């Protein structure tokens, strides 16, 4: 039995906290919303994110960052990408020893184009950094929390950290594979959100299976091109952290990114869609990062470019689809 602090009280952090508690670990969650914390401590629920799920009664929550930091030596960073750097810096100020950091964020930082493990590494001083890893793959929180069979990948530059993640989370409904390609696993998780928004647009516009299959296939090609340029193993994108995550995010109404795209395809603006959803949609920020990163690296990413125009330049979705279909002739 290990003590683990979960930073963030969103849907996935809550679902994974439940997994850890059911695996016999002592779990403390940290969040900023007092009502969420009180609800979890009193009723063992987090209705804002997993409205019908009854959580393990051993899970506790706090708004006290220092209490959360001192509670354990293993930190699960279940925060949106844009919050990772700030919270990591705040944590570092309170540390007196090395900690292991496991993140589940799927994004790329806007200004630096850094992956989440790099953001944590930047923010945590070397004397406090006991290793950084990621848990990623096709894993909707709504299914994990009700013990639907789920399979994910754990990755780190340190194989001992990958194995620790595997040992902490694996049980009879959550299977965890280790993967030594940290770059590929992180990029696969982040970049698929772009394609998921585009997939939702296609569905929202009423296009059929042919268009959806084409989008996912060509989307995977984009992900692989950029990933390989950034040092990832192309084979990673054929695994759980790549095509596995891509399929589940591009085909499910559980996916926030797909849902946003669907609303865009129906004619709503991004602002209108987000107002309805009231949730963080990582793919928006990732689209912005990857659009500029691809230009910097000289990597062709037409789907990403088209989505960037829709989200940030107010180009109609119908025009973007037409632009993609009318591109110059090419070999596959």
UniProtKB/Swiss-Prot annotation:
Keywords: Cytoplasm, Lipid biosynthesis, Lipid metabolism, NAD, NADP, Nucleotide-binding, Oxidoreductase, Phospholipid biosynthesis, Phospholipid metabolism. NADPH binds at residues 11-12, 32, 106, 141, 256, 280, 282. The keyword Nucleotide-binding applies. Its EC number is 1.1.1.94. The active site is at 192 (proton acceptor). It is an enzyme of class 1 (oxidoreductase). Pathway: Membrane lipid metabolism; glycerophospholipid metabolism. It comes from the Bacteria. GO terms for biological process: carbohydrate metabolic process; glycerol-3-phosphate biosynthetic process; glycerol-3-phosphate catabolic process; glycerophospholipid metabolic process; phospholipid biosynthetic process. Pfam families: NAD_Gly3P_dh_C (PF07479), NAD_Gly3P_dh_N (PF01210). It is found in: Cytoplasm. InterPro entries: 6-PGluconate_DH-like_C_sf, 6PGD_dom2, G3P_DH_NAD-dep, G3P_DH_NAD-dep_C, G3P_DH_NAD-dep_N, NAD(P)-bd_dom_sf. GO terms for molecular function: glycerol-3-phosphate dehydrogenase [NAD(P)+] activity; NAD binding. It catalyses: sn-glycerol 3-phosphate + NAD(+) = dihydroxyacetone phosphate + NADH + H(+); sn-glycerol 3-phosphate + NADP(+) = dihydroxyacetone phosphate + NADPH + H(+). GO terms for cellular component: cytosol. Sn-glycerol 3-phosphate binds at residues 106, 137, 139, 192, 245, 255-257. Catalyzes the reduction of the glycolytic intermediate dihydroxyacetone phosphate (DHAP) to sn-glycerol 3-phosphate (G3P), the key precursor for phospholipid synthesis. Belongs to the NAD-dependent glycerol-3-phosphate dehydrogenase family. This is Glycerol-3-phosphate dehydrogenase [NAD(P)+]. It comes from Staphylococcus epidermidis (strain ATCC 35984 / DSM 28319 / BCRC 17069 / CCUG 31568 / BM 3577 / RP62A). The gene is gpsA.
């Amino acid at each position: 039995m290990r003590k683990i602090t979960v930073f963030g009280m969103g849907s996935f952090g809550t679902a994974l906290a439940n997994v850890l508690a059911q695996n016999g670990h002592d779990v403390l969650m940290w969040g900023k919303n007092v009502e969420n914390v009180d609800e979890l401590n009193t009723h063992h629920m987090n209705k804002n994110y997993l409205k019908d799920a009854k959580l393990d009664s051993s899970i506790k929550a706090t708004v006290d960052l220092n209490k959360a930091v001192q509670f354990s030596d293993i930190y699960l960073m279940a925060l949106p990408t844009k919050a990772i750097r700030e919270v990591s810096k705040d944590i570092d100020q309170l540390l007196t020893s090395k900690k292991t950091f496991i993140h589940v964020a799927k994004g790329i930082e806007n200004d630096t184009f850094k992956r989440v493990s790099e953001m944590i590494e930047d923010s945590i001083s070397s004397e406090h950094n006991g290793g950084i890893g990621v848990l990623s793959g096709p894993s909707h929180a709504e299914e994990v929390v009700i013990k639907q069979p789920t399979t994910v990948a754990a990755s780190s530059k340190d194989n001992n950290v990958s194995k620790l993640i595997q040992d902490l989370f694996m049980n009879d409904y959550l299977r965890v594979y280790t993967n030594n390609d940290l770059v590929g696993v992180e990029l696969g998780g982040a970049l698929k959100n772009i394609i998921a928004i585009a997939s939702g647009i296609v569905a929202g516009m009423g296009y059929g299976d042919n268009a959806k299959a084409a989008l996912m296939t060509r989307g995977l090609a984009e992900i692989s091109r950029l990933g390989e340029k950034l040092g990832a193993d192309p084979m990673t994108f054929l695994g759980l952290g790549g095509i596995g995550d891509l399929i589940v995010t591009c085909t499910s109404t559980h996916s926030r990114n797909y849902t946003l795209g669907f609303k865009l395809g129906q004619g709503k603006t991004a602002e209108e869609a987000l107002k309805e959803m009231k949730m963080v949609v990582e793919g928006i920020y990732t689209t912005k990062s990857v659009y500029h990163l691809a230009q910097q690296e000289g990597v062709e990413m037409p789907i990403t470019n088209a989505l960037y125009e829709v989200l940030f330049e107010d180009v109609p979705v119908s025009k973007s689809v037409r632009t993609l279909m009318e591109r110059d002739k090419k070999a596959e």
